[in-house]
A protein has these predicted regions:
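Sequence/fold signature of self-assembling virion shell proteins
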Residues: 2-59, 79-87, 187-282
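Intrinsically disordered or highly flexible coil/loop and linker segments, enriched in small
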Residues: 15, 50, 126-130, 168-171, ...
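Residues immediately flanking
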Residues: 44, 97, 178
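P-loop NTPase signaling cores
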Residues: 59, 65-66
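Long, hydrophobic/aromatic-enriched structural stretches that serve as scaffold segments
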Residues: 71-109
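Alpha-helical scaffold segments that mediate packing/assembly in large oligomeric complexes
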Residues: 97-165, 277-282
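Extended, solvent-exposed, turn-rich assembly/linker loops in the middle of proteins
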Residues: 135-205
Length: 282
């Protein structure tokens, strides 16, 4: 005699693990795109210091020399760089009324939208930001193999490069993959002092040479990513539009339609690119 066994569906959903975005720690939103799809930033030149021409009794014989005692009188240059938003992305899906009822309400528009943002939208935005930052970094030494013996010295070299470029010493962040962080924890020089819960809640796992250490999943970073030391002033990461809607009463379906649109981008500022040091691995 055959027996048909019962299959029970649990009233929970097996969602994917997805890390929270850390981009806000590494970038800024100092510029306003309201009413425009692009903005232009001025880059103003400077002039060198001269030896003041004191006690001069005759006009200079060299006609190329300025009559001014302060030095040659030249105009400052004012060039621009354009920041044009390139990513205008969208999604749409339907939650059928019968499907919602017959899945014990697990297929529900509100939670489905939150899942879409967490598992699809945020990872894409993050990946774009990290790609832009590594591509536009002002310091990019040759790719090298990182080990527990050299990782600490390599990071100190990055810190020195930013110091020599006169990048502010505060608010720096060190971006590492889980693999790089594992090497760092094995380095004898690493300070294993535990940090507070408040900093961990923000995504900071340690502090090294004054920089907050931020661990980012490898899937959101370029291939061969070793580590990146950054100051947030170097990268602008605007999100001009975030438009997400749940439409219950529509003639297009017997159910709930969820739509979303996000317009975003990231830019490394030309005069501040020295605030990013990117080390690739072999």
């Amino acid at each position: 005699m055959s027996v048909e066994l019962t299959t029970k569906f649990a009233p929970q959903t097996d969602d994917l693990f997805k890390a929270e975005s850390k981009v806000g720690l590494l970038t800024n939103t100092d510029y306003d795109w309201t009413g425009a799809h692009a903005i232009k930033l001025y880059k103003i030149s400077t002039t060198p210091l001269n030896d003041y021409s004191r006690n001069r009794s005759t006009a200079p014989e060299d006609t190329s020399e300025s009559l001014s005692r302060y030095g040659k009188l030249l105009d400052l240059s004012a060039t621009t760089e354009e920041l044009l938003l390139k990513h205008d992305r969208s999604f749409i899906f339907n939650v059928d009324r019968l499907d919602q009822d017959e899945t014990q309400q697990q297929l529900e528009a509100g939670t489905a939208l939150a899942r879409e943002l967490r598992e699809v939208v945020i990872p894409e935005v993050d990946t774009n930001v990290y790609t832009v930052m590594t591509t536009g970094a002002g310091h990019k030494p040759a790719a090298a193999a990182l080990t527990k013996s050299n990782i600490y010295a390599a990071i100190l070299a990055a810190s020195q490069a930013l110091d020599d470029a006169e990048v502010p010493e505060t608010e720096r962040s060190l971006v590492v993959t889980p693999a790089t962080y594992a090497l760092l924890k094995q380095a004898v020089e690493f300070d294993h002092t535990e940090i507070g819960a408040e900093m961990r809640a923000r995504g900071i796992v340690a502090v090294l040479d004054g920089a907050n250490v931020v661990k980012v999943p490898s899937a959101r970073l370029p291939e061969k990513f070793g580590f990146m030391l950054v100051h947030p002033s170097a990268t602008v990461a605007p999100v001009k539009l975030e438009d997400f809607g749940i439409h219950d009463d529509t003639p297009l379906s017997s159910g709930t339609i969820v739509t979303g649109r996000i317009c975003y981008d990231a830019f490394v500022l030309d005069n501040k690119k020295t605030g990013i040091y990117y080390q690739a691995i072999t």
